[in-house]
Amino acid sequence: RGELIGVKSNKFFSDKPHGMVLIPSGSFTMGPSNPSVVLDQNPTLKTVSVKAFYMDETEITNSEYRQFVNWVRDSVVRNELAVAAYYKIGEETKEDDPLWDFMPVYNRAGDGEEKTAYQEYLEENGLGILDIENKSTYRLNWDVKIPWDRSDYLDANYAAVIEGGIGPDLLEDYEGFFIPADSTPNALRAFKTKRIKYNYRKFDSKNNKWSEYEEIEIYPDTTVWYKDFSYSYNEPMHNDYFWHDAYSEYPVVGVSWEQAKAFAHWRTFYKNQHQRKARKNIQLVSDYRLPTETEWEYAARGGLERAEYPWGGPYTYDDKGCFLANFKPERGDYIADQILYTAEAESYWPNDYGLYNMSGNVSEWTDSNYEKGANDFVAGLNPNIEGSEDNKFKVVRGGSWKDVAHFLKVSTRDYEKKDIKRSYIGFRTVQSYLGEDVGFQENPNKIF
């Protein structure tokens, strides 16, 4: 009737992501409860307000990060098979060719399926292939399985792409994806982890433009178990920690800040890809990302103002003398808390928000740049220091299995270069809560 009624839209309900808990909006006093001029990097106290967000209840585990690695590995292999198929088949359509299914085609019609006008247009202009040199313009076929067993190889051309060498119908010598058997221990078949690279780009909101594509090797550095400890026997951890099922639920380590950012980007892409396939016009999820330093401290406190540790008290043990976190209680004594290295990600009691190991186990990357005395100049609303690309140091929080109790305090700041990988640094991700979290109880995730 000529009234202003707004654009019709669906009612939006924020679904809690799997494995995450809601951290409600609130304010708190950021900084140490008992400032020490000698030890504290940020002795100034500052009251700040934080918008609600979801946070992983545990650190990202080896099992979860392996899902990322396997997806990237498969995409790299599919891409190489797609390129091989493109240049081998060219304009001659040979649907009976073993490599045909790996052709990068956008919405190719199946057998007996009536083509849409758009599919006809795509096929008329190059079989739906857009630009084989530009990965952003074509899609890989994820419906076809990759035969890994050598007895199941499709043909000699497929074998050449996977193992390396020249195929009978291929135009180039392929590098292959496996290390030669004579170069591996016990002639084991080992994938070339250097080839597992994730390509993505970010939107620069300050300059209002997309960044160039970044290519990042995402396999964890297992040699950190050697590098971090001189004259120390840690070979079993180097050999088994990331891939063995015994450590599946342990926090991933040996991951740089850049790799953690790539994981968060992939997690967003992976979820939204599922959302698009589920049904049309579905809302895409907010980006997964690393927490800011302020978000991390706010979540670690669990709603307890002025607490030194996530459990609230000033001590690292309970009334029975049991330690409340995985850390190094005494000089040279890593086992006093009954755990030598890392513990399972869901170990010890969670804090009042339901978050595990916000102190100890592994230190955690945050998104924030490190600046000494940051509390003196950051904003009071969702404070964060993004800084410039020249700042290579990122804030690390929480302390780890090899740290003394001081680093376990929720206010203690530490830092590391963003491209450095350590056997004691992991990460967890967050997702911004859309809308206001009104109507929730004070601690909606409290479990005891």
Pin down the residues of each PLM region.
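A short glycine-rich, aromatic-capped structural motif
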Residues: 13-89, 93-262, 268, 360
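Bacterial Sec-dependent N-terminal signal peptides
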Residues: 1-5, 11, 17-18, 263, ...
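Short Gly/Pro-enriched turn/cap motifs at secondary-structure boundaries
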Residues: 11-12, 45, 252, 334-335, ...
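Short proline/glycine-enriched turn/loop segments at secondary-structure junctions
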Residues: 384-388, 414-421
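Glycine/tyrosine- and acidic-biased, solvent-exposed loop/turn segments at the edges of beta-strands
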Residues: 10-11, 448
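Short, structured beta-strand segments at or near domain termini in extracellular proteins/domains
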Residues: 423-439
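Generic recognition of flexible, low-complexity loop/linker segments
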Residues: 9, 352, 415-417
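Functional-site microenvironments in short loops/helix caps that host divalent-cation chemistry
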Residues: 22-23, 29, 34, 147, ...
